[in-house]
Swiss-Prot record:
Residues 50-53 are annotated as: Interaction with substrate tRNA. Catalyzes the transfer of a dimethylallyl group onto the adenine at position 37 in tRNAs that read codons beginning with uridine, leading to the formation of N6-(dimethylallyl)adenosine (i(6)A). ATP binds at residues 25-32. The record marks 116, 139 as: Interaction with substrate tRNA. This is tRNA dimethylallyltransferase. Substrate binds at residues 27-32. Monomer. GO terms for molecular function: ATP binding; tRNA dimethylallyltransferase activity. Its cofactor is Mg(2+). The keyword Transferase applies. The keyword Magnesium applies. It catalyses: adenosine(37) in tRNA + dimethylallyl diphosphate = N(6)-dimethylallyladenosine(37) in tRNA + diphosphate.
Amino acid sequence: MSIIDSTTGANASNSPLSPLLVILGNTGSGKSALAINLAKVIPAGIINADSRQIYSRMDIATAKPTLSEMLEIPHYLYSFIQPDQPFSLAEYQTLAYQAIDSLHTQNRLPVLVGGSGQYLKAVLEGWSIPPVAPDETFRAALFEKAEKEGGDVIFTELEKKDPQAATQIDPRNIRRVVRALEVIHKTGGKFSGLQIKNPPPYRVFKIGIHIPREELYRTVDLRVEKMLEQGLEAEVRSLLEKGYKASLPSMSGIGYRQIAKYIEGSISLTEAVEQMKFETHRLIRQQNTYFRLTDTNIHWITLEESRSNGIIQLVCDFLATENKNEIH
């Protein structure tokens, strides 16, 4: 018997909804490892929901799956955008839906994996992204301000103008902060108020991996050290030598920004490492505004449970039912 016996889209109204598994949680919590382990047992494909893993040539600090893992199991939306290529949330949403539907036609379970809350919400809640044309002059002024005074300055401005939007946007993602302020500037309304929701026709089961904060801090600190051992400095040098400027949105990611500063001579390597750890801790706290243990729509598991056979049975039970609420 196939794992997917239903249709999607307009024809789904009289049919069971096609399944979509979501694996979410903090950075460094083991989401990709769980997805890959599941896909080795259940016919599945993995779809990226991490805003940093979309870029090519940027592999180490983004902690992408390895090449061998991506060759063994179908992976979508990884390493397909050049570091200097603009890419919008609306484009991601469209491509994610295409990947989900493609996997359904292949009789594979789509597994959406990531920690970028905005990417996940755009797909799962069916956001209608505001059709506001870019204002290059306004954007340039904000980018210049962020470069001179720091990204925190314009993020604080967003917090004042639209507190709800500020809770949904990574403060380190300057491009998305600028976009939100741009929409507010051009429409006179709140960015958060313009996001109309139209959930897609999928039967969704969300699994979240929870690791106590202090334990997770220790894990990501060790991962920072490992990234340096894996050649992060050489990766950043290669990007800069190829002409990718440190001011690019893609280069604002944790690891790339700090190592670029070290290479430019503005900070020491020790300072770069400490900043990477500090920023990763801050990202974890930011992600916790998206992924709450009190969210009853998420089935929370421990790291140990994510490595057990029980999680495979849990997903099989989900596939065998027509109502995710029957899964406990």
